[in-house]
UniProtKB/Swiss-Prot annotation:
The lineage of its organism: Bacteria, Bacillati, Actinomycetota, Actinomycetes, Kitasatosporales. It comes from Streptomyces coelicolor (strain ATCC BAA-471 / A3(2) / M145). This is 3-dehydroquinate synthase. Its cofactor is NAD(+); Co(2+); Zn(2+). One of its GO terms (molecular function) is nucleotide binding. The keyword tRNA-binding does not apply. HAMAP family: DHQ_synthase. PANTHER family: 3-DEHYDROQUINATE SYNTHASE (PTHR43622), 3-DEHYDROQUINATE SYNTHASE, CHLOROPLASTIC (PTHR43622:SF7). Coiled coil: none annotated. InterPro entries: Dehydroquinate_synthase, DHQ_synth_AroB, DHQ_synth_fam, DHQS/DOIS_N, DHQS_C.
Amino acid sequence: MSEAVTRIQVGGTAGSEPYEVLVGRQLLGELGGLIGAKAKRVAVIHPEALAETGDALRADLAAQGYEAIAIQVPNAEEAKTAEVAAYCWKALGQSGFTRTDVIVGVGGGASTDLAGFVAATWLRGVRWIAVPTTVLSMVDAAVGGKTGINTAEGKNLVGSFHPPAGVLCDLAALDSLPVNDYVSGLAEVIKAGFIADPAILDLIEADPQAARTPAGPHTAELIVRSIKVKAEVVSSDLKEAGLREILNYGHTLGHAIEKNERYKWRHGAAVSVGMHFAAELGRLAGRLDDATADRHRSILEAVGLPLHYRYDQWPKLVENMKVDKKSRGDLLRFIVLDGLAKPTVLEGPDPAVLLAAYGEVGE
């Protein structure tokens, strides 16, 4: 795939406006056009690790005539708290931020989740633009309009559906990404392959080592294909009334692991274990063939993602899953596969089957 800019449309549903996801290199020149002439002020929310990037972006926007401020927040999941959100609200209030002004969220998935949540809640909703800088945030967090913060009770339990006005995926940002962060994001890419686009799996399996680096020949295509999977789903189901649930493949157990680890595990690592579990659950429930279940193990292992978690933590994980957003009443709900690219819901599975599936994951 060439380095030309790819534009992916995300359709407006549930009263939201349609928007574009741009994928390419050197895209920040597009930012002013997305912000528009109506905005007087722009707030750049960025993590501590991207302080230089955030300040450079603020300076560039100021040079374009905007009253630009940079709001620095903690790195990774430590940013997704009510206290950090309140810190951002205070900064917006002190700068006189109005409904015509714009928030720009720069960084990984946690940063864009927070920026979107702050935008959703300030003055009951202001426009925001996502500038994701990791694989995870490009293919997942920044697309689709889910915003949120974590609480002691679980991950993303407080949040809002508030789609961005646009998303800029500048692939140059991936060049300096630590390898573990890059590989973590591949979990969401692989998920897209299993639930909707098997060509993604073929590209990775052809050269797993090349898939582990942004310099790989298929990096742009893998990211574009993954974004298109999510864009198609959320365009028809913004608020997770039905189809969008398939994007939670691997996430029920994954989120439970993240909570159990107090959000010190990378999201992609937890989702990788969650997909391995979901594949075994689908197999044991008589839904998924052996070859596709085994393919989960081989492709995740080939790119260096984890397959296992501590067996003795199963009771805690079950309790965590009971407060998962996807649960209905007292019934646990899992996304499983009836076959490759055939996701479906498995509701209230037998606890013995769940334990047996976890037996393949636990160590």
